[in-house]
From Swiss-Prot:
Organism for this UniProt entry: Influenza A virus (strain A/Kiev/59/1979 H1N1)
Summary of subunit composition and partner proteins: Influenza RNA polymerase is composed of three subunits: PB1, PB2 and PA. Interacts (via N-terminus) with PB1 (via C-terminus). Interacts with nucleoprotein NP (via N-terminus). Interacts (via N-terminus) with host MAVS (via N-terminus); this interaction inhibits host innate immune response.
Similarity annotation: Belongs to the influenza viruses PB2 family.
Residue ranges of the TM segments: none
Sites annotated Mammalian adaptation: 627
Record protein name field: Polymerase basic protein 2
Source domain of life: Viruses
UniProt motif (Nuclear localization signal) ranges: 736-739
Length: 759
């Protein structure tokens, strides 16, 4: 107070005012503050007083030859005075206007290429549709979101190497372009940017936008894909939202979405196979998404979703340290606990063995449609503050938190037996049993939980067992809040381990993820997902299994043919025939298999009875464990299109139709490809069965005596030549090889040479 009086007193004297307003500033500290360092201390002020001057801009001397001294209105564009401290001229802002209107025009061809991200954005906004504005309370939670649509997914280092290679190809420095995407992008950009006059630094900045994913931790209510984030300022305020439908797609959002679908399908399929982990890896390595290998996408894409993270863990990549339960992502924010096995009794007196977490802990729970803060002690929920889009979402979050708390009243609320199984028909672990039980019906759980009187707290309301809000009462410890809970912001990743059954644990042994946590939601992928693994043939139903099985045989016919004659058992056990078995009626599988195997054996024994079409057609049936019986079949049944359809043992049928003239195979009316070899020639298989270890020299030669039979051939010495009878009476000259060669090359060259010899 005293100081203020003193200052008022000083200001009332006229001399003080004059000193303060008129004298120059010569205090060293002040001069230092505004002159030291390159950083402008008051940019807007500086800009204002610079622009108030007549010639605030400096330009290269050459400008005087390119711009007239005065414009059409007679205003001076540049001063004859040169800039103090440099050999540049002082120029008026009017010169810029003149240049923009009358200056030289360079080629604009590179602009859309360099500024691609901007041009694309304009297109998206032009074709996007903005709907009505709604006024309502917005529950925003901070999430880590992708802020530049249309980018590739290179790491910062990879992008840096690409940019250096494209923009500054002659600069010294080690650049290693290894990944396929790096090489493709580099080649593409070098071609696009030939003779580009835009400043290299600008090109580098723009390339970075195109190549690297940039994420920010932003408050969002609604869509989180980059196409929605770029219009965040137009679609949601504090108390309003505007509907928006993006115009067009951007590849990065499509990749994220398709990756999640592929990962879910793969994890679900792997979980039911004999060795889930091996199967999962095999599928990840043989799947492509939009033409890019899935494993390459997994290495670069930071998407955090349960199935995606299981695939990453299997590949030995680091993942987020948060764990998943009931479809929510939990992150411990404080406290600690130790785990102990405990046996508990359900309301139905069934014993459950659960791993109890002893100790006080706090967690954030983040789901797609609801978020919460959970505070719990040993087997006790202390507090749950939940917020969500609607009643249903809030109820789901409450159920998950109640189960997570492991409270006794929750376990006692179980009515009936718990015997839920996963896709592989294995019993779920107790915590997931409870979760599934209450997801079906949580009435008893909510009724038994208990109710308490509540104090009114700003922004919070109570919730009753029937999910109606109340300001007086609430389920014990549970409140609904207007404010959302932010997602965990840290991007730190941890080393994890994964077991055979796809359970992912951190280094302390806590389970972070398991196949039970993978969402059952089905979606349609935006990019084409190509699963090359036979395990995924079932994904599109029985027809796809049928087509894929036969396509596989046709594509690999050369190898299949040799195995058929040399090592049939190995061929019958191939995993590619596994999916097919589900199409064959269970009761008769064994008989079919026995019948087909016997038929094949006769074909091997009796020369000239090899029939390509028939082998291809019947091979998948031979894969089941055979039952010996004297039964003969003229047709075999497969279950497709909801009923049994017949495949004729001899001849074509709607299921399996082979056109000998075009060599095209049609399965259920769909094209299944072309056989590269003519099955009409009965020689086609014999040569592979017989002529392994022999080189075909050409047509038969009388000087080498009469044609030998197949059996006599085996007596030849290495290097010895002989005529041999093959197929339907054709004679060729062969020589026994001097060294053993691969089965494959022998039979492939045999096929070609026999044709040449015969024709």
């Amino acid at each position: 107070m005293e100081r203020i009086k003193e200052l008022r007193n000083l200001m009332s004297q006229s001399r003080t005012r004059e000193i303060l307003t008129k004298t120059t500033v010569d205090h060293m500290a002040i001069i230092k503050k505004y002159t030291s360092g390159r950083q402008e201390k008051n940019p807007s002020l500086r800009m204002k007083w610079m622009m108030a001057m007549k010639y605030p801009i400096t330009a290269d001397k050459r400008i005087t030859e390119m711009i007239p001294e005065r414009n059409e209105q007679g205003q001076t564009l540049w001063s004859k005075m040169s800039d103090a401290g440099s050999d540049r001229v002082m120029v008026s802002p009017l010169a810029v206007t003149w240049w923009n209107r009358n200056g030289p025009v360079t080629s604009t061809v590179h602009y859309p290429k360099v500024y691609k991200t901007y041009f694309d954005k304009v297109e998206r906004l032009k074709h996007g549709t903005f709907g009505p504005v709604h006024f309502r309370n917005q529950v925003k939670i901070r999430r880590r979101v992708d802020i530049n649509p249309g980018h590739a997914d290179l790491s910062a280092k990879e992008a840096q190497d690409v940019i250096m290679e494209v923009v500054f190809p002659n600069e010294v420095g080690a650049r290693i372009l290894t990944s396929e995407s790096q090489l493709t992008i580099t080649k593409e950009k070098k071609e696009e940017l030939q003779d580009c006059k835009i400043s290299p630094l600008m090109v580098a900045y723009m390339l970075e936008r195109e190549l690297v994913r940039k994420t920010r931790f932003l408050p969002v209510a609604g869509g989180t894909s980059s196409m929605y984030i770029e219009v965040l300022h137009l679609t949601q305020g504090t108390c309003w939202e505007q509907m928006y439908t993006p115009g067009g797609e951007v590849r990065n959002d499509d990749v994220d979405q398709s990756l999640i679908i592929a990962a879910r399908n793969i994890v679900r399929r792997a979980a039911v196979s004999a060795d889930p982990l091996a199967s999962l890896l095999e599928m990840c390595h043989s799947t492509q998404i939009g033409g890019t290998r899935m494993v390459d996408i997994l290495r670069q894409n930071p998407t955090e979703e349960q199935a995606v993270d299981i695939c990453k863990a299997a590949m030995g990549l680091r993942i987020s340290s948060s764990f998943s339960f009931g479809g929510f992502t939990f992150k411990r924010t404080s406290g600690s606990s130790i785990k102990r096995e405990e046996e508990v009794l359900t309301g139905n007196l069934q014993t459950l063995k659960i791993r109890v977490h002893e100790g006080y802990e706090e967690f954030t729970m983040v789901g797609k449609r609801a978020t919460a803060i959970v505070r719990k002690a040993t087997r006790r929920l202390v507090q749950l503050i939940v917020s969500g889009r609607d009643e249903q979402s809030i109820a789901e979050a409450i159920i998950v938190a109640m189960v997570f708390s492991q409270e006794d009243c929750m376990i006692k609320a179980v009515r009936g037996d718990l015997n839920f199984v996963n896709r592989a028909n294995q019993r779920l672990n107790p915590m997931h049993q409870l979760l599934r039980h209450f997801h079906k019906d949580a009435k008893v759980l909510f009724q038994n939980w208990g109710i308490e009187h509540i104090d009114s707290v700003m922004g919070m309301v109570g919730v009753l067992p029937d999910m109606t809000p109340s300001t007086e009462m609430s389920m014990r410890g549970i409140r609904v809040s207007k404010m959302g809970v932010d997602e965990y912001s840290s991007t730190e990743k941890v080393v994890v381990s994964i077991d055979r059954f796809l359970r992912v644990r951190d280094q302390r042994g806590n389970v972070l993820l398991s196949p039970e946590e993978v969402s059952e939601t089905q979606g349609t992928e935006r990019l084409t997902i190509t699963y090359s693994s036979s395990m995924m043939w079932e994904i599109n139903g029985p027809e796809s299994v049928l087509v894929n099985t036969y396509q596989w045989i046709i594509r690999n016919w050369e190898t299949v043919k040799i195995q058929w004659s040399q090592n049939p058992t190995m061929l019958y056990n191939k995993m590619e025939f596994e999916p097919f078995q589900s199409l064959v009626p269970k009761a008769i599988r064994g008989q079919y298999s026995g019948f087909v195997r016997t038929l094949f054996q006769q074909m091997r024994d009796v020369l000239g009875t090899f029939d390509t079409t028939q082998i291809i057609k019947l091979l998948p049936f031979a894969a089941a464990p055979p039952k010996q019986s004297r039964m003969q079949f003229s047709s075999l049944t497969v279950n497709v299109r909801g009923s049994g359809m017949r495949i004729l043992v001899r001849g074509n049928s709607p299921v399996f139709n082979y056109n000998k003239t075009t060599k095209r195979l049609t399965i259920l009316g769909k094209d299944a490809g072309t056989l590269i070899e003519d099955p009409d020639e009965s020689t086609s298989g014999v040569e592979s069965a017989v002529l392994r270890g022999f080189l075909i020299l050409g047509k038969g030669d009388r000087r080498y005596g009469p044609a030998l039979s197949i059996n006599e051939l085996s007596n030849l010495a290495k290097g010895e030549k002989a005529n041999v009878l093959i197929g339907q009476g054709d004679v060729v000259l062969v020589m026994k090889r001097k060294r053993d060669s691969s089965i494959l090359t022998d039979s492939q060259t045999a096929t070609k040479r026999i044709r040449m010899a015969i024709n």
